[in-house]
Amino acid sequence: MALDIHAHRILILDFGSQYTQLIARRVREIGVYCELHPFDMDDEAIREFAPKGVILAGGPESVHEANSPRCPQAVFDLGVPVFGICYGMQTMAEQLGGKVAGSELREFGYARVDVVGKSRLLDGIEDHIDADGLFGLDVWMSHGDKVTKLPEDFHILASTPSCPIAGMADDARGYYGVQFHPEVTHTKQGGRILSRFILDICGCEALWTPSKIAEDAIAQVRAQVGTDNVLLGLSGGVDSSVVAALLHKAIGDQLTCVFVDNGLLRLHEGEQVMAMFAENMGVKVIRANAEEQFLNNLEGESDPEKKRKIIGRTFIDVFDAESCKLDNIKYLAQGTIYPDVIESAGAKSGKAHVIKSHHNVGGLPEEMNLKLVEPLRELFKDEVRRLGLELGLPYDMVYRHPFPGPGLGVRILGEVKKEYADLLRRADHIFIEELRKADWYHKVSQAFVVFQPVKSVGVVGDGRRYAWVVALRAVETIDFMTARWAHLPYELLETVSGRIINEIEGISRVTYDVSSKPPATIEWE
């Protein structure tokens, strides 16, 4: 009988915290499957999910205010361990008979908590011991309210000068709460604390590993698809590449990929995709050379949103035309990943309960009448990358920087022209090449060049040159929700600028974007 890698599972209830997805990623990293659901998940659904433990995440509300979110009673009726984090601790305390109040002194940022009580959760976990033999932890706080009275059978686990009950425990029931955030890297022992709860207290086994995920996904695809044929839009991005590798391993020649070359790809990207999948792996790939069609449709349009829509519609037209040439296609494969599913479910707000299919291909015509196969829909991006490596995809492909769906179309400001795209892809190639040489490519989260439809005077030899301006953009980020501009060495910027201006005749000036997000976005359009 095949191993069920979902058998040991953790339920995470979302109360609106910006860190909730991070909790789920940390649980997965420990090797245990988990799912994220809104705080008002139906009682019957909770029982059917049958978790080995429950984590109550944080949130921006105040427990003592009217109509603030509450944990379903079914969670406390399950008889499994429960771990409340920040707001999760507060609502647990209040619902089990304790009290919560606003605090005059709010705690945001780094803090030290003293471990003042023994418990299965924190015993043996510390960052330092003071002269009095008191254990301390360096943690990240983000709260205004605090627990002022413990529920019955709980004892104080940790405290700070402004928050005497910074942690609480009821070892008999396996109920724990902490006011700090163990899921963020700023809490140095956070990983150990979560591991202690999940592996030791909940008794979960680490079944969620890349090799087991690959085996499970292959088995699931074979069971779903049977002998039918599957169509995949292959973009060369991480998600579609991993789907292609996975499906090829699962069903071989039953898979056909359509690679739409829109003329807005990176330098040599089309050739690289064909070499990797068609030549090296033996995947059936149809390359649709549609550069002229895309550029004709984009002619004269400079509005960013309209450009995106034109590119999306043209992709659908090309993809549909190619798929009509194929016989007996029953399934459409998509690279939907777990954050897409969460977003579609509205988990952050808790307002939506139905998880809808996330059509990341972009609204394919309903008359195609194909059933969906989405083998990555349970995985976070970092898990997709690890799965890609497990399936034999090259590291450089799996860990490439994100590339927007509309491609260079949104990195060319204003109207898109072939001349601009050709100049931009060469400049971008130089930038990425030099980042790799200087060992900076994997130190930044995303790097690219933006073409500006502005001309500037330059000097080449004894003559003047009136040519285009480009901007370099490199950012560092954890979640792409916020980002800071990367402080690249001046010598590296000088090398990149010199190469672009000297090697590309149509460019006379290179600038560096020092805008962070917010207020700027990462992409310019």
Swiss-Prot record:
Chain segments annotated as transmembrane: none
The pathway to which it is assigned is: Purine metabolism; GMP biosynthesis; GMP from XMP (L-Gln route): step 1/1
User: What is the name of this protein?
Assistant: GMP synthase [glutamine-hydrolyzing]
Write down the chemical reaction(s) this protein catalyses: XMP + L-glutamine + ATP + H2O = GMP + L-glutamate + AMP + diphosphate + 2 H(+)
Q: Which residues take part in binding ATP?
A: S235, G236, G237, V238, D239, S240, S241
**Enzyme category, top tier:** ligase
* Residue intervals of the Glutamine amidotransferase type-1 domain: 9-207
The active-site annotation reads C86 (nucleophile), H181, E183
